[in-house]
């Protein structure tokens, strides 16, 4: 009987340690802040825009986000400048689970294949910004 009791205590201790470790891992994952890719895109009069290529970019860019569970939060909406100089083009904001996924998307083969379309017809400033965790 003593052996069974010791075995039961050992199993319970192992389960408790496993649960504590799982909770610690989950807490660490929950604290990873989201990330946002922010793009300021301006038509460049010195570059020749190819309408067919621009349509391809508009179709393929959203598809390239799917593998990274990302989504557009802002995609060229109306801008009201509250302070400072107004952007000359439009703004795009894309939400990601974390910075690693945002960078993974930007350097992914799917986005690398279409990135030159945007680069050849616009001036862009692309940033990745770490957000804050839910509080």
Identify the meaning behind each predicted range.
Residues 10-20:
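Bacterial N-terminal signal peptides
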Residues 3-4, 73, 116, 123:
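Intrinsically disordered, low-complexity sequence elements enriched in Ser/Thr/Gly/Pro
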Residues 1-11:
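Bacterial N-terminal signal peptides that target proteins for export
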């Amino acid at each position: 009987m003593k052996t069974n009791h010791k075995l039961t205590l050992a199993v319970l201790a192992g389960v408790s340690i496993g649960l504590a470790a799982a909770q610690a891992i989950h807490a660490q994952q929950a604290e990873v802040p989201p990330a946002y890719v922010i793009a300021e895109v301006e038509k460049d009069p010195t570059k020749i825009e190819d309408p067919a290529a621009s349509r391809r970019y508009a179709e393929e860019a959203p598809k390239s986000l799917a593998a990274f569970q990302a989504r557009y939060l802002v995609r060229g909406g109306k801008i009201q400048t509250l302070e400072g100089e107004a952007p000359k083009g439009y703004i795009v904001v894309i939400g990601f689970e974390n910075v690693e996924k945002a960078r993974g998307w930007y350097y992914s083969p799917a986005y690398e294949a279409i990135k030159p379309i945007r680069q050849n017809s616009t001036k862009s400033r692309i940033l990745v910004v770490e957000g804050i965790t839910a509080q």
